[in-house]
């Protein structure tokens, strides 16, 4: 049965094994186009130690996929990966994390990824750090944190606080606009991947269409890029993606995604002052985006059938 409580538990605190993490990463943009290739040596050096890690970057830089890769390349790959999303923790969820005997903080020999620590209040950050230290969580597990920095700004103070207290190593994920020279290769590799998942084939993209993509600001970075290119590929009725199609999509995108909006890394908290149907649909949409549009994995994570998922999306 689909319930808010069950769904929130699956989204806020998630446990995954190696095979599930491999599946998630292999279908991600980072894996498909090799975005972490430039950071390979940095990641290898980080994994030579058991020090806590702080992953940071702008919104939409797919930090969770970078953490998946970090986990898979580490000596902890055969133990569970636990993901705690601070942004989706309500009062009960926070109390569970801090006080419950089954809290992830009571685990041992796990990789624990606590994401979006920058959305916590100062008191919450202090409580979390105090519990981690008092319970030796960092000595019994591999700890990874993440935070979001604003455009062209350094790590936020919340992230710096954790880095200093926990002696974290840091992994910075550059924004998409810093890879403009690699844009044609990234687009074409992703289109090749999409061709394996669609019933039609897209041969490529017009030169002017590529220039328009390169000039776009991409405020939500890779998560926005992946969604837009996938939409262009699925909607085109021609062998190539045209400049007109790109212009239309980007114009619409600019009107609904303002610069500075928080992307996949920090979703807006659930508004519970709505009907049950509206809240359920919001949860489904968030999970669908996390699963890169894969309806089968979304239904499995939410504990519902694909038919139920389809009906909830349609309503």
Task: State each model region's role.
Residues 118, 203, 216, 270, ...:
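Helix-turn-helix-type domain boundary/helix-start signal
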Residues 69-70, 131, 228, 232, ...:
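Hydrophobic residues on the short alpha-helix immediately C-terminal to a glycine-rich phosphate/catalytic loop
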Residues 7-9, 16, 22-37, 41-44, ...:
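Nucleotide-binding/hydrolysis machinery
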Residues 252-269:
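Intrinsically disordered, low-complexity linkers and terminal tails enriched in Pro/Gly
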Residues 59-63, 68, 123-127, 151-153, ...:
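Bacterial C-terminal helix-turn-helix
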């Amino acid at each position: 049965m689909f319930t808010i409580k069950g769904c929130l538990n699956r989204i806020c605190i998630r446990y995954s094994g190696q095979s599930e993490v491999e599946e998630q990463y292999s279908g991600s943009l980072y894996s498909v186009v090799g975005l972490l290739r430039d950071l390979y040596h940095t990641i290898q050096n980080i994994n030579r130690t058991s020090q806590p890690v702080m992953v940071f970057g702008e919104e939409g830089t797919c930090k969770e996929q970078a953490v998946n890769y970090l986990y898979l390349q580490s000596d902890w790959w055969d133990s569970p990966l636990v993901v705690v999303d601070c942004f989706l923790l309500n009062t009960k969820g926070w109390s569970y994390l801090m006080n419950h005997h089954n809290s992830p903080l009571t685990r041992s020999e796990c990789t624990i990824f606590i994401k979006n620590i920058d959305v916590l209040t100062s008191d919450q950050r202090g409580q979390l750090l105090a519990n981690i230290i008092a319970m030796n969580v960092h000595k019994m597990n591999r700890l990874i944190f993440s935070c979001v920095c604003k455009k062209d700004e350094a790590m936020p103070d919340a992230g710096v606080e954790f880095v200093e207290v926990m002696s974290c190593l840091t992994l910075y994920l550059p924004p998409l606009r810093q890879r403009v020279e690699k844009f044609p290769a990234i687009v074409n590799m992703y289109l090749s991947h999409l061709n394996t998942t669609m019933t039609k084939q897209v041969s490529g993209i017009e030169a002017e269409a590529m220039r328009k993509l390169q000039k776009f600001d991409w405020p939500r970075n890779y998560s926005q890029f992946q969604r837009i290119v996938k939409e262009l590929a699925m909607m085109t009725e021609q062998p190539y993606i045209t400049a007109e199609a790109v212009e239309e999509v980007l114009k619409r995108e600019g009107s609904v995604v303002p610069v500075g909006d928080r992307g996949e890394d920090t979703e807006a908290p659930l508004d519970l002052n709505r009907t049950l149907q509206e809240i359920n649909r919001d949860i489904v949409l968030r999970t669908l985006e996390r699963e890169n549009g894969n309806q089968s994995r979304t239904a499995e994570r939410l504990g519902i059938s694909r038919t139920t998922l389809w009906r909830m999306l349609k309503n």
